[in-house]
Amino acid sequence: MWTEKQKKDAYEILLLQQQGLLEAEDNWLANLANSSALLNETLPETVFAGYYLFDGNELILGPFQGRVSCTRIKMGKGVCGESAEKQVTLIVDDVKKHENYISCDSAAQSEIVVPMVKEGHLIGVLDIDCGVTKGY
């Protein structure tokens, strides 16, 4: 497991790499695809890194890296639906202890979900699952 300093340093490097990818391309689909690949390859123990896009009713699976996953998530359901509905970042140290958890991959032990909001409107969420508890 990482120390807090190692985690901070890795996140800073990851942010610089992501910024470089975004500067080189303006297509949202290509950017989401490359972003999920970067996250999957950079963050240790990652079992899923991807995006769920909001279609006005529910979250639909978008570009991701990992195993086959849930394709649709209702608002308020699971960590992704909860994060999307509340428009807040959620960090779950142990998914087995989270009451509202939806298991899309049995290898996931911890999870972080970050809502994507533009001008007050939900676009979707970034979902990253880790194969160990307290991964984030």
Question: What is each PLM-predicted segment?
Answer:
Residues 1-62:
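Intrinsically disordered, low-complexity terminal regulatory regions
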Residues 110-117:
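A short, aliphatic-rich beta-strand micro-motif
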Residues 46, 54-104:
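Regulatory sensory and allosteric helical modules in signal-transduction proteins
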Residues 1-4, 129-136:
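Regulatory loop-to-helix N-cap segments in sensory/regulatory domains
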Residues 124-125:
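Short glycine-/small-residue motifs
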Residues 20-24, 101, 131:
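General structural signal for alpha-helix termini and helix-helix connectors
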